[in-house]
Amino acid sequence: MDKIIILLGPTGVGKTGASILLAKALDTEIISADSMQIYKGMDIGTAKPSVKQREEVRHHMIDIVEPSETYSVGRYIEEVVPVIDSLHKKGKIPIIVGGTGLYIKAMTRGIFSGPSADWKLREELTALEEEQEGSLYSYLQELDPEAASKIMPADKRRVIRAIEVCLKTKQGISELQKKLTNPLPYEFIKIGLTRDRKELYKIIEARVDEMIKAGLVNEVKNLIHPFTHLSAVAETAKAGSPIHQLSSMQAIGYKEIAMHLNDKIPLVIESQRLEETISLIKRNTKRYAKRQFTWFKKEEDIHWIDITGIYGNKEIFERAEQMLNMLCPKNRHRTINA
């Protein structure tokens, strides 16, 4: 069975640099498993590999859709399979890199086949929640108690999706999720990078500061600018995906800055407002990293490497390479798929 290497871990842990060195060592290419790096123009806030890095090693499943488009895990699977197969035909082992647990689970465990988004229904549900906060979660508890127990009340998008599935299929999403499609027919070698939580949080804070310095605010301005024109708004509405519900605009960093840019607080305290926004991005990113840890820890077949205190890409790569050679003792580097 053809092999696939998966290098996973929480945001900011150190996957990107190490994965590029690993891809060079194995003479292969990288496939992104990041649900936000798929969007064009969202470079800084999603920490995409740099142009130089992508010239050194070819990356797939990055910059494939516009921010105004909707994208599902089902579509990801449909589009990633041909990429994987083409690499296998070339005698290469794909390296899948990312932190989107749902994408990785869909490949390795399978996915449930749910209905497509019903934007009119979502708008109606959103309106109900705006009228009475907490009403949707209570509704979900009635429709599907099991699903409600696994979703945080504040996670409005997941609450709405669970209700949507219940209403469209007449079945609870918790039941449908038990009827998974088959996993992709490959041998998956999962290597996870982890480090001390406090250390990771410090890295995240520093990275957010770097993103702001690199121009994240202007990047968000450029992204939302087209939607300030009535024609673009009308076209988006016609397509059935309200701007505030676009998946791309739910990305951490983008959502907070978009809110910051739309705020009417006087410019006298503009700098203070930006600092509050930056703090919010840091807090939300750390919470996301915590959720990623929780998600990945449920997977029993991940081979974890603790890289606490290790910051250099070369050192992280060497640890990953050692793990790979231990898992495949009869194979080395370029011949690992033999």
Describe the predicted segments one by one.
Residues M1-A338:
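Phosphate/pyrophosphate-binding catalytic cores of soluble transferases and nucleic-acid-acting enzymes
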